[in-house]
Amino acid sequence: MIRTENLKPYFAPFLWENQAHHKYILKEYIQLLILDYLTTTDFVKKIVFIGGTNLRLVKGIDRFSEDLDFDCKNLSNSEFLAMTDGIVEFLKRMGFEVETRDKPNDKLKAYRRNIYFPELLFKSGLSGYKQERFLIKIENQDQQTAYTSQMATIKGCGLFFMFPVPADDVLCAMKVSALLSRQKGRDFYDVMFLLPQTGPDFNFLEQQCGINNAFDLKKALLEMISTVDLKHKSKDFEHLVFNPLSIKRVTLFKKFIEEWEMERTD
């Protein structure tokens, strides 16, 4: 198991100035280990890396992410359990003390496994409390929309590997869909990161949200914003951003959408 201070060369010095970031740096290292391990298994053929951690590790967004999310096609629950059991055994071989604590949830449509690391923060000198919780949630869910994945290079903490990911426009559509359905602060932030780079895949959005053009998307986003306290939303992911001042951009989301250049989606 690596010493936390050995990760310093892989991260910008300013990130180490904030002690609160250290546990997320450690988590990112473990996320990279898990992804790298999965590339050695047959399960990687049935999953696509999505979500906020994709944005962090593939696209380079300036915030940490907490979970590993995958779109899965033709992956059974028993295969998911076998996949995550393999992850647990791999982490143990790497020197981590790990355990799973899962409660049945009939409302959950995804496969989910919570991997806990008892006393890891305490033993790493990142917390004065033995019982402080540290976990990585792994979630697989079929997005119910067909698209062609592509291979992306992922590198960090001395690791270098390829992993299946969605195209940028599909990833953008996934984030827009998530924003419209749950309105988490980090979703606003992520959409503001993605939309200037690529328009969303409207085939995906049409199947997920019934939106098939930029005009209707802009209308839906502005209608959604009218019921949301953006200042409040900007606070719910403050602990994840590299620079706490960056969360203020979420309060400008309405103006951002109003000025969004729709021709980028043509």
Label the model's feature ranges.
Residues 1-32, 39-47, 58, 75-266:
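Structured mid-to-C-terminal alpha-helical surface segments
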Residues 52, 59-81:
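Catalytic metal-binding acidic patch
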Residues 52-53, 186:
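Gly/Ser/Thr-rich helix-start
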